[in-house]
Amino acid sequence: MNIELKDSSHGPVYAQVRDQIENGIRTGQLASGETLPAPAALARRLSVDQGEIQRAYFELEHAGMVKKESGTDFLGKPKTTYRMK
């Protein structure tokens, strides 16, 4: 899914990200079980603060649209992933 930000008149960054992901889920562009980009990676790609992406994911999780999973990567470092429900 390609997330694009508009200027600030379209709302805060986290809300734009959240709304685009919600729309992707509703239209079937994002399938159940599909993994979202890591918050840090998406923040870098969009040139925004990572907290904006984390807030969007948090709101999607609490709306029951995304599931947060904790685990470890292949080096044993903690890793969090977000998947579509």
Q: Locations of the language-model features?
A:
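Glycine-centered flexibility sites
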Residues: G28, G33, G64, G71-D73
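N-terminal helix-turn-helix
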Residues: T35-K68
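Short, structured secondary-structure boundary patches
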Residues: Q54-Y57, T72-L75, K85
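Extreme N-terminal segment that seeds HTH/winged-HTH DNA-binding domains in transcriptional regulators
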Residues: M1-L36, A41, R45-S47
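Short, Lys/Arg-rich nucleic-acid/phosphate-binding segment
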Residues: L36, K68-Y82
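Long, contiguous secondary-structure blocks with strong helical propensity
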Residues: V13-Q16, E59, K85
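Conserved segment of winged-helix/HTH DNA-binding domains
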Residues: N2, T80-K85
